[in-house]
Amino acid sequence: MNPSSVPHPLPPPGQQVIHVTQDLDTDLEALFNSVMNPKPSSWRKKILPESFFKEPDSGSHSRQSSTDSSGGHPGPRLAGGAQHVRSHSSPASLQLGTGAGAAGGPAQQHAHLRQQSYDVTDELPLPPGWEMTFTATGQRYFLNHIEKITTWQDPRKVMNQPLNHVNLHPSITSTSVPQRSMAVSQPNLAMNHQHQQVVATSLSPQNHPTQNQPTGLMSVPNALTTQQQQQQKLRLQRIQMERERIRMRQEELMRQEAALCRQLPMETETMAPVNTPAMSTDMRSVTNSSSDPFLNGGPYHSREQSTDSGLGLGCYSVPTTPEDFLSNMDEMDTGENSGQTPMTVNPQQTRFPDFLDCLPGTNVDLGTLESEDLIPLFNDVESALNKSEPFLTWL
């Protein structure tokens, strides 16, 4: 053992020990040589397990020659195919004996190509007018010569839906499967379909017998059609009921309008009309229309039980001016006859009030006064009128 590899005793606490390497370059060169120039050695000198030096006894440790626990012998392998042997968890391997496994082993070992999973609907015949063809890559699609459509969906799967599924989803119909055009993804198939449309002229019910189809499958489209008709009837009834309610509402509005017109006083006929001919024509077209007033696109909107002339739909207007006010229009001083006042009014009514006579300086002829002479007179009038409010001044 190398003495340098022996661990040195621990120094006492509180002391330090310094180790000095004598030949560092020689030891480093030896390490490089041992790695770069390894010496040949026998495998026997290495610490290896015993199974490393022994050949395998059988093929049980190899994937290529694995055997079945039931005693079956492996059959010949096929190039390019998947080898299928009976698994250890198969119930058949537990029930069969050694002799039966040896006889049935090669028959069950077979290879198959990749294909679609098995479907029960593949055994059913296609509906009348349908044809199944394949693309260049082996993908199948279906042609309907009656409706002249092309789809990836199998029409037999739609017919094979259970009846309880139809009851849970009544809106699903036989034609609800989305039909995607083949011309978008497969242009060549669209041209091929045009050539195959000629076959549709020779199709007839005799060429496509339906006796082989089960009765349950044929009743599904009938049930779907019946439910669709019932839904259409319900929608039609709702539309009719809504139309009847609109008509009754319109009649009620017309009756209310007639009642309000009868309650109108007769004096309103003598009032000045405001665009009554044009308004009555438009209103007559609205009220006499048999359609919904909210749907005919008219510019008028009605409001229930409104007596405001600006918002009502009637052909009347409620007066807001007192009736006895208009009869006294002749007594009022308006701007129209203001220019005729000096000739029609009595000259005695133009004299100043009596209280001006008691004021100083007012015993002179007022007609001969100039504007400058009237200024002190106006000041006296202001002082007489503003005795209670002496703090106010005129500007």
Curated annotation (Swiss-Prot):
It comes from Mus musculus (Mouse). A motif (PDZ-binding) lies at residues 389-395. Residues 224-258 form a coiled coil. InterPro entries: WW_dom, WW_dom_sf, YAP1. One of its GO terms (molecular function) is protein homodimerization activity. Signal peptide: none annotated. Phosphorylated by LATS2 and STK3/MST2. Phosphorylation by LATS2 results in creation of 14-3-3 binding sites, retention in the cytoplasm, and functional inactivation. Phosphorylation results in the inhibition of transcriptional coactivation through YWHAZ-mediated nuclear export. This is WW domain-containing transcription regulator protein 1. Residues 221-395 are annotated as: Required for interaction with PALS1. The modification Phosphoserine is found at S62, S89, S290, S306. GO terms for biological process: cilium assembly; glomerulus development; heart process; hippo signaling; kidney morphogenesis; mesenchymal cell differentiation; multicellular organism growth; negative regulation of canonical Wnt signaling pathway.
